Structures are given as structure tokens and as C-alpha cells.
Curated annotation (Swiss-Prot):
GO cellular component labels: mitochondrial inner membrane; mitochondrial large ribosomal subunit
One Pfam family recorded for the sequence: PBP
Subunit structure comment from the entry: Component of the mitochondrial ribosome large subunit (39S) which comprises a 16S rRNA and about 50 distinct proteins.
Keywords, alphabetical: Coiled coil, Mitochondrion, Ribonucleoprotein, Ribosomal protein, Transit peptide
Designated name of the protein: Large ribosomal subunit protein mL38
Predominant location: mitochondrion
Superkingdom of the source species: Eukaryota
Gene this chain is encoded by: MRPL38
Targeting presequence: 1-26
Localization: Mitochondrion
InterPro entries (alphabetical): PEBP, PEBP-like_sf, PEBP_euk
Coiled-coil boundaries: 101-122
Protein's organism: Bos taurus
């Protein structure tokens, strides 16, 4: 005979396992401003204004997205708050250019090109040639310094050299390494130069007024073997009269790049400082020759902080360099030390906990958990 229904319910309720949770309700605070769509009367949606066009809706949505709100979006909440106005500019002031005169000059050049019969004929016959040297000179004079600044920020030069302070390289700095008698390897803004090509001091040229004083620095930002935040100074020429680098005081003799094997690309930066007056750099002088790495330990930030009242960064050029066979000769013959070799040790691959019965797994499943690299079931 079946038990009464109330007995079944009673016995079932006694054996029922209750549900519990450790979650707690958070206290809801009043919003800091009006919430989205709180002015809409949801009880009568028919009276709402109809857009009747997707274009109207899109324009209204874009206008609403551009309007300031009291809440922060996802990008604003997780994005880095970096205001370019907060950075310190330690460079030369921008040149004073009359915008009206500049526009008039451009219009004059366009008018001459449009009225020139020779230019029209060369363009029609596709025989026109563009003077690249003039184009580069115009680029250096107008937007080139700002492009160089963006490249230096991308490579982290300002962050590592001046602790975040920035400057616009107003003075074009041209650096080239001589290979043989005729070939030159130029240094631009991040190109690769091998240690073999940079074995000898480069040719450095720039435009300078007669009577001005300059300082030229070559430093390795990534090559220090003991201190992660230190640099190696490879060349330092101070009190340069005008653009005659050979007549300056070689405070630190030139040392070829020696990026250690396995350490990847190193950043080498040429910095040109403009001096207000002759400066005494006796405290920064290194012996000649200088093959002790401890004596070449350098901090550009401390060097500039020490002489910031008398000089201003004005020019910049940098290249990337990695190991080749000539670095071994530098370590053994010049530095008289054993060559360090680095290797990137990859982390071990992650494998989940081994199952006792790996259902529907391939045969090589067991190879993941063996100490040796020999396959369990041969080659397959």
C-alpha cells in the first residue's frame, strides 16, 4: 500500500539538503550623476520620439558619445593617464617663424611651378626629377625634428636617458662610419650598424654658428654587464668650436661597440649638446686609452644634471647594434677579459596533471610526463 502523500512530503523535506552561500549583498550608494536613459518613461514607449532613419540615430549616438559624462568608459578606466603637457622640455626653444610669410612663400612656389612650361612638359613626358637633397633639407627644416622626437620616444631613449624629460632635436646631426675609402654607413634613427662597421670613430657633421661651443656624446643604453640602469660611454668630445669635431677636447676616447653575444640589439645614441660657454669637464675625463669598463660606467641623466646650467641637448641620432665576430676580438684584445655569452632560457612548458586513465588521448600523451626526450612508442 502506498504511503500517504503528506508522509512522503514530510520525509522528503527532512532528507532535503539546504542551499547556502557565502556571498553578501554589497551596499548600493547613490550615483554621482544622472544615469543613462533615466529620463525615459518606460510605461508609455509609444510616445517616444522616432528617428525614422538609421543616419539620424547614428549621428545622435555619436554626438552623445562625444559629450562629457560623469562616468568613465572602459578605455578611460584602464588606459594610461599621460598628459603630454606634464612632460618637461629640456631642449632648445622653437625658432620664431612667421606663418604668414611661410604661406606666401609656398603660394609663390606653387605659382611658379604651375606657370613653368618646362616643368609642365617634364611632368607630361614623365621625365621630371625631384631633388632629394632639397626635399631632405626642407624636411629637416620643418617637420623632421618632431618626427625624430616621436622615434626617440618609441625606442624609449628619453625615458632611459633623461628619466622622462624630452626635447626636440632642432639641430640636424649627421653621423656616418667610413668603410674603406669610398663607402659610408650612415646613422639615422634606429637603423642597424654592425660592430665591424663601427670599429673606427665616425664622421660627425652639423650646422653651427662660428664661436659656438658643443659637446658630443656616444653612449650604450643596454650594454652594462653589472648594473641594469647604467650605461657605457663610448665617446665624449667636449668644448667643440663650431662644427669642427676634430678640434674638440676628447674627454673620453672612442671605443667600438661590444654588445655581448646573446643579449640582442643594443641602443647606441649620439647626443649633441649646445654649450653657452666653455665648460670644465675635468671631472668626466677618462684616461687614454681607457679599456677598463668600470671607468666607462656612465649615467647621462647625472652628466646632464651636473652641467645643465651651461649646456642644452640640441641634436640626436641613434642606431641599433648586435653581436658579430669582431666583438670577440674587442673583449680578448682590448678589454683583456673573457667574453660573456648569454642565452635565453625559456620557461618549461605547462602540462596539466597527468591522468591515470587518459581517455581518448593520443599515444604521445605519455611523452609529456617523461624525464627523457626519447619517444615512448618510437617515431610516429
Amino acid at each position: 500500500m502506498a504511503a500517504p502523500w503528506w508522509r512522503v512530503v514530510l520525509n522528503g523535506s527532512r532528507n532535503w539538503r539546504g542551499f547556502s552561500t557565502s556571498a553578501a549583498l554589497s551596499r548600493r550608494a547613490a550615483p554621482l550623476g544622472p544615469m543613462p536613459n533615466e529620463d525615459i518613461d518606460v510605461s508609455n514607449l509609444e510616445r517616444l520620439k522616432k528617428y525614422r532613419s538609421f543616419d539620424r540615430y547614428r549621428r545622435r549616438a555619436e554626438r552623445e558619445a562625444r559629450d562629457p559624462h560623469w562616468w568613465r568608459t572602459y578605455r578611460e578606466h584602464f588606459g594610461e593617464e599621460s598628459d603630454p603637457k606634464d612632460t618637461v622640455d629640456i631642449g632648445l626653444p622653437p625658432p620664431k617663424v612667421c606663418r604668414t610669410q611661410q604661406l606666401l612663400e609656398r603660394k609663390r612656389v606653387l605659382r611658379e611651378l604651375r606657370t613653368s612650361v618646362e616643368e609642365e612638359r617634364a611632368s607630361r613626358l614623365r621625365t621630371a626629377s625631384i631633388p632629394l637633397e632639397a626635399v631632405r633639407a626642407e624636411w629637416e627644416r620643418t617637420c623632421g625634428p618632431y618626427h625624430k622626437q616621436r622615434l626617440a620616444e618609441y625606442y624609449g631613449l628619453y625615458r632611459d636617458l633623461f628619466h622622462g624629460a624630452t626635447f626636440v632635436p632642432r639641430v640636424p646631426l649627421h653621423v656616418a662610419y667610413a668603410i674603406g675609402e669610398d663607402d659610408l654607413v650612415p646613422v639615422y634613427y634606429g637603423n642597424e650598424v654592425t660592430p665591424t662597421e663601427a670599429a673606427q670613430p665616425p664622421e660627425v657633421t652639423y650646422e653651427a654658428d662660428e664661436g659656438s661651443m658643443w659637446t658630443l656624446l656616444l653612449t650604450n643604453l643596454d650594454g652594462h654587464l653589472l648594473e641594469p640602469d647604467a650605461e657605457y660611454v663610448h665617446w665624449l668630445v667636449t668644448n667643440i668650436p663650431g662644427s669642427r669635431v676634430a678640434e674638440g677636447e676628447e674627454t673620453c676616447p672612442y671605443l667600438p661597440p661590444f654588445p655581448a653575444r646573446g643579449s640582442g640589439f643594443h641602443r647606441f645614441a649620439f647626443l649633441l649638446f649646445k654649450q653657452d660657454k666653455p665648460v670644465d669637464f675635468s671631472g668626466d675625463t677618462r684616461p687614454s686609452p681607457c679599456y677598463q669598463l668600470a671607468q666607462r660606467t656612465f649615467h647621462t641623466f647625472d652628466f646632464y644634471k651636473k652641467h645643465q646650467d651651461a649646456m642644452t641637448p640640441a641634436g640626436l641620432a641613434f642606431f641599433q647594434c648586435r653581436w658579430d665576430d669582431s666583438v670577440t676580438h674587442i673583449f680578448h684584445q682590448l678589454l683583456d677579459m673573457r667574453e660573456p655569452v648569454f642565452e635565453f632560457v625559456r620557461p618549461p612548458p605547462y602540462h596539466p596533471k597527468q591522468k591515470c586513465f587518459p581517455h581518448r588521448q593520443p599515444l604521445r600523451y605519455l611523452d609529456r610526463y617523461r624525464d627523457s626526450h626519447e619517444p615512448t612508442y618510437g617515431f610516429y
